[in-house]
Amino acid sequence: MADLLQEIREEYQLYTYDQLQYKKKVNSISDMFGLKQKNRFKTDYCAAYVIGRFQFAPIVMFGLNPGYSMRNSPIEENEANKSWQNYQNFYLNFFRYFSHNKFESPYYTALWYLLSGLTGTNFPKKRKWELFDQYLCNIELIPYHSEGIMLPDILNKEQFEYLQERYISNINFIRQFKPKLLIFNGKVWKTLLINRDLIEQHIEAPNAKQFRMYFFELDGIPSVLFDRFFQRHFLGITNDDRMFTIPKLIHDRFENLSHDLEKR
């Protein structure tokens, strides 16, 4: 556990005490991936690695990187950069903070449908932050904010090694808390885990939509990978798909998952 938490603390200290070096580091990562304009990582926001109560969350969502909202992000930043203790408390209780401030997010609205279907809970949409606080932890592959993001389909050696190191650090951290389901969201995960053979075996789910799902296990933990961002409506994914079709495919594959989520 100490490795990732130490990495997060060192990153926070760099951001707090040496802004110039922090900006150079973040810019170098943007340069590594050839990112331009709004896709470049923001150098004036502290990194966000783990969001939610990771010790207890049964569902872990692995994303690409934290996004950016003109309304929400400056408020988040003001809270996170007050102190190291405040940073930890803020991201641990992130969903409660969003609930208290009545924040809205298209991503989390789409995620409410998916988690409602997976957990079989009856949290209404207006109480989605309570659902996330009880069930969800987000872990970012790249911890820096950006307005958009587009990574190469084929990774060079430097890009692959950076992403592999971050993936291993995240997995080694979260596996000790024994979550019940891991979800990998986005094309980069197919590029990294499947195309680069970081997982030994996987099964492609039957699916008529314009994206693919892959099932596998990591240390016995049920895992699912979406090769596109599941929250994007233009891919032909509907809210009914998120609440019913996709959860059914996952539960059909991992028959004990419903029971495991109920036991939390």
PLM regions: where:
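C-terminal capping/extension of enzyme domains
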Residues: M1-I29, I154-I171, W189-R264
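A polyanion-binding, active-site-adjacent surface
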Residues: A2-F177
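A short helix->loop->beta-strand "cap" motif at the edges of active sites that frequently abuts
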Residues: A57, K178-K180, L218-P222
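Short, solvent-exposed loop/turn segments at secondary-structure junctions
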Residues: N65-S69, I142-S146, K187-T191, F229-F234
